[in-house]
Amino acid sequence: MKVVFVSSEIYPFAKTGGLADITGALPRKIASQGVKVFGFMPLYKTVDINKHGIIKIDASVDVNLNNRVYTFEVYKKIDDATFFFLKNDELFGRDYLYGPPEGDYPDNDIRFGSFCYAVMEFIKRENLNPDLIHVNDWQTALIPVLNYHKYNNHHVRTVITIHNLAYQGIFDKFAIERLNLGWDLFHMEALEYYDKVNFLKGGIVFSSAITTVSPTYAKEITFPEYGYGLDGVLRKYSNKLYGILNGIDYDVWNPETDKYIYENYCVFTIQKKSINKKLFLKEVGLKDEAKPLYIFIGRLAHQKGVDLIRDSIEEMSKMPANFAILGTGDKGYNDFFKSIEGKYENIFIKVDYNEAFSRKMYAAADFLLMPSLFEPCGLNQMIAMRYGTLVVARDTGGLKDTVKDVSQPDGYGILFKNPIKDEFLNALYRAVELYNNKKLFESLQKKVMEIDFSINNTAKKYIKLYESLKYSREVKI
């Protein structure tokens, strides 16, 4: 089987968030199980081609759009899968992938629309002849539209994965003309969305299958609360909507081999985790290692429940616990957390993101905080548990699928239902009680380290989906 896998970011080449982590790990794992995989990504200015061994090949692709010709040079890297990188410096030779902190680039429709065309042209010209094309999020969502309407590849199945429905790629209606899509696609059953063009909607309508990154999120997005205006469309196409839980690469996230943490350990030497805690507290200036250490790692954004942390900070400062917060994001949150750096003796704050430092945090912590308003899947909780860190999270999306409250039989985490301050604080206090029950706490640390959240499980389910689509069988995953 041959699969083309397309994403706007793929780790380790380019990353702004969890999308890159999963699109970096998944195609490689699928390829390792016997599928021929061709990955595609724009070649951004920020990609270090020398570091990653990416080489230019004797190929280019021309895309005619908006009375312009956009020429893409082609670069290539071969590891577990074959990756192609399409380079156009006018469109992608910029400082950011999607736009500066102030907002998205205004020509993102042309940028990613032309990239989608370039992928399809390269597939055609190089006779890749894939059985299936797998695209991710709005940036690549025009590919199922083009595959069906422009290239008439009705035999080539397409899968679109929705990693976060909040981002849809919505542009003014004249994007239809700029992208040579034709006004016959500007209607409610295609790309039209409240008199605008919606890339993600097009991908949903014209794909052979829709996947999301957890079973619970697949259900949630068919309701208005989580549907971001597309819940009706998703209900209509629910017969081809599947929730496949993301996973993490256990070779990348492994406390036994992680070169960034203070002391390596495994489930059999978990007592060494306390060395990581002691040295981390010393590094950041926190005291009393006998207290539980809570960490937050992530985007400082409304979606991540950062308001709950901000509004609870005074109460947190009085708890018998230490806190470490690492993240950057929206300016308002950045400014707030910078303003209280060093204010509380039990709260360390670093408004930044550094993966090496985050690994030290995972290895040192007793609890990870994930108070998200919604969470399509979440990888942080899986990473935390891999490192023997228990999770305090809101009962939503992928968190519901991966964290089981200790009040339940075989539970191993702390969940709270509503995104309100009192419930969040109650969850923190419940975690303190759990921590003080040393025998139970230590047994749960070992338990979560042995739960299998490997990307291998995700890859196997996608291969089943691909085969079902290729052979027009009933999908059973």
UniProtKB/Swiss-Prot annotation:
Keyword annotations from UniProtKB, A to Z: Glycogen biosynthesis, Glycosyltransferase, Transferase
An individual GO BP term: glycogen biosynthetic process
InterPro entries according to UniProt: Glyco_trans_1, GS/SS, Starch_synth_cat_dom
Pathway terms, separated by semicolons: Glycan biosynthesis; glycogen biosynthesis
Single GO MF annotation: alpha-1,4-glucan glucosyltransferase (ADP-glucose donor) activity
Binding site for ADP-alpha-D-glucose: 15
Any coiled-coil regions, as ranges: none
Catalytic activity: [(1->4)-alpha-D-glucosyl](n) + ADP-alpha-D-glucose = [(1->4)-alpha-D-glucosyl](n+1) + ADP + H(+)
Entry's family note: Belongs to the glycosyltransferase 1 family. Bacterial/plant glycogen synthase subfamily.
Role, per record: Synthesizes alpha-1,4-glucan chains using ADP-glucose.
Protein name per UniProt: Glycogen synthase
Species lineage: Bacteria, Pseudomonadati, Aquificota, Aquificia, Aquificales
